[in-house]
């Protein structure tokens, strides 16, 4: 025991604690800074004190703010909930709505301590307040999208209605055509009994002037000319009077015909959404070959060299068959300078051979030169191999 006391005294002397103060520890009460040696040593050492936690009450939670109150990690703010909870602790979380919350907040409101401006709860509330304008902007965007959706629905309904009107106008147009045929027959029967003097016709009904004569090279293509219609003939009278009678007798029919024509023209200008959206589900994508890594495989085109015998022979044969199949009238005036195998052009005068035969002989010479050159190239390649 004496050894332990000596060790304690040496330790106290080392830290600078007087022995008289140690003796007073046993006589004092069990609270304060003198109740243990550890507290006394900690008081003597130049240590920075730790920040003390500040307990505060969380305000009333409702259904709107419950999702924005932070994480599920427990903290010192959950102590009052645990102490005052009447139900099982495993059935409740911090973000849930508690029973009798208003009564609890009114009871613990006067006991609320001073808030630390750097506490996590205050920072959490500030972030929630900062998020409010973002939520309002999102609500405005959703409202704008809903308005646009209603506008699109109204447009689709209008398009469907116009399609139905178009079908109805088509059916009515068939009925009007039948009525016109019957009226035309009646007017033709009436016109057979009418006769009009040539002096009573207006001056606007005159024969058109004759067309100018065509040049002699196109005279064979000119259609046969018909004699001009006399202004006093009965045919014009018969054709004009029924039209005037029909316009006088049926003005309402003409107006309805014009209105139906304008409506059908408008319906043709507007595209039909039903036809556009009809084949949306039938779209099929083309299968693309991919490598094991997932990249699409692109087929490389074969680059034919200029001295490849196969390409030379195929080019010569193409020229030959193209020359045989081409029967245009410009074939005689075509020059041979574009061909890479052509010989220098000589004068075409003084030859007894016709022009077509000369062209054929030149083409055969070009083809034979190309074939000979291709065979020589293949022999060179085989000798090198």
Swiss-Prot record:
Return the Pro residues bias intervals.
Answer: 207-216
Q: What is its main location?
A: mitochondrion
Protein name per the record: Mitochondrial fission regulator 2
Q: Which PANTHER family match?
A: MITOCHONDRIAL FISSION REGULATOR 2 (PTHR14215:SF2), PROTEIN OF UNKNOWN FUNCTION DUF729 (PTHR14215)
Q: Which domain of life is it from?
A: Eukaryota
In which residue ranges is the amino acid composition biased (Polar residues)?
231-257, 336-346
Keyword annotations for this protein, in alphabetical order, are:
Acetylation, Mitochondrion, Phosphoprotein
Subcellular location(s): the record lists: Mitochondrion
Q: Where is this region: Disordered?
A: 195-268, 331-363
Is the keyword Acetylation assigned to this protein?
Answer: yes
The entry's family comment says: Belongs to the MTFR1 family.
Cellular component GO terms held in the UniProt record: mitochondrion
Give the organism the record lists.
Homo sapiens (Human)
The question of whether Phosphoprotein is a record keyword is answered with: yes
Q: Which residues carry this modification: N-acetylserine?
A: 2
Q: Which GO terms describe its biological process?
A: aerobic respiration; mitochondrial fission; mitochondrion organization
Protein function: May play a role in mitochondrial aerobic respiration essentially in the testis. Can also promote mitochondrial fission.
Q: Which residues carry this modification: Phosphoserine?
A: 119, 291, 328
């Amino acid at each position: 025991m004496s050894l332990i006391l000596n060790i304690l005294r040496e330790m106290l002397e080392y830290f600078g604690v007087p022995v008289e103060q140690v003796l007073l520890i046993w006589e004092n009460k069990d609270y304060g800074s003198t109740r243990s040696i550890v507290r006394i040593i900690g008081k003597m050492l130049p240590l920075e004190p730790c920040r003390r936690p500040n307990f505060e009450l969380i305000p009333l939670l409702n259904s709107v703010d419950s999702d924005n109150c932070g994480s599920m990690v427990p903290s010192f703010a959950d102590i009052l909930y645990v102490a005052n909870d009447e139900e099982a602790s495993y059935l409740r979380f911090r973000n849930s709505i508690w029973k009798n919350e208003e009564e609890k907040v009114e009871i613990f409101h006067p006991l609320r301590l001073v808030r630390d401006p750097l506490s996590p709860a205050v920072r959490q509330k500030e972030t929630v307040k900062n998020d409010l304008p973002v939520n309002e902007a999102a609500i405005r965007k959703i409202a704008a999208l809903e308005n646009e959706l209603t506008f699109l629905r109204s447009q689709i309904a209008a398009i469907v209605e116009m399609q139905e009107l178009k079908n109805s106008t088509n059916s009515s147009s068939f009925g009007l055509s039948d009525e016109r045929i019957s009226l035309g027959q009646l007017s033709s029967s009436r016109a057979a009994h009418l006769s009009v003097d040539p002096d009573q016709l207006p001056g606007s009904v005159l024969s058109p002037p004759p067309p100018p004569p065509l040049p002699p090279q196109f005279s064979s293509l000119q259609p046969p000319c018909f004699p001009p219609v006399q202004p006093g003939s009965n045919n014009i009278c018969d054709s004009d009077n029924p039209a005037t009678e029909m316009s006088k007798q049926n003005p309402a029919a003409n107006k309805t015909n014009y209105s139906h024509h304008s409506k059908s023209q408008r319906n043709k200008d507007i595209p039909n959404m039903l036809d556009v959206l009809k084949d949306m589900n039938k779209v099929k994508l083309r299968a693309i070959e991919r490598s094991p890594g997932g990249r699409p495989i692109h087929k490389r085109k074969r680059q034919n060299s200029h001295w490849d015998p196969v390409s030379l022979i195929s080019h010569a044969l193409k020229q030959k068959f193209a020359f045989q199949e081409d029967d245009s009238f410009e074939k005689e005036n075509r020059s041979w300078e574009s061909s890479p195998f052509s010989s220098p052009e000589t004068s075409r005068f003084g030859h007894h051979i016709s022009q077509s035969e000369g062209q054929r002989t030149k083409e055969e010479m070009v083809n034979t030169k190309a074939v000979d050159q291709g065979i020589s190239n293949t022999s060179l390649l085989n000798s090198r191999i």
